[in-house]
Amino acid sequence: MLVAAVDLPTPFQTVKLPDIPKQGTARYKAVAHVVLHTTGGYPDSKHPTPQRIRPEAAAPRHCLATDVHAYWSRTDRIGAAHILIDADGAVYQIADLSTRAMYHCVGYNQVSIGVEVVQQSDSSLFAAQLVSVVALCSWLADTFKLPRSVAMPYTGVRDVVDGVGVLGHRDLSSNRGSGDPGDFVMEALVDAGWAAV
């Protein structure tokens, strides 16, 4: 469905960071997918610090959403997403969901909402972030009438994505390897009852 201006509801929108000034134009196609990313990702399974999940609560020093927002706001950066999930699980909207993000996934910007999970320098994520991924994706699926299906297991870049509600950047771009966002993020949705397709 095409949408007018959409903002995340409470409790997700704990803080709305300013919209990134370079955000794209209004959508001319319906939202068909959520594309999940991690800020670091990793290029392949040989990465020296593969992703891991930290069970403890994130300390303030781990919360980097405002740093990511500032980086994406620079005029020399083309990347961006609609939503950030910080280390403590806080969800930040940084672009109107009714617009296409300027650039988060080649070929899918017009038909998807980009969600970036903030990763630590050692590639780790916090368990609270996975809880927020599930809650946010569930809300997005309800709001945009998306199927509760997730691209799992990872099989490389997919030629066909019809009927898949949530994809990883890794499923759509050959230069992302298996780690953007990585199995932990995708498995959280399957564990919450989403269909693996």
Model-derived features with residue positions:
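Basic/polar, cationic surfaces and motifs that engage anionic cell-wall
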Residues: 1-15, 24-29, 121-197
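Structural preference for beta-strand elements that scaffold enzyme active sites
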Residues: 33, 112, 165-167
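Substrate-binding clefts and substrate-entry loops adjacent to catalytic sites
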Residues: 100, 114-125
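N-terminal catalytic cores of peptidoglycan-degrading enzymes
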Residues: 1-109, 177
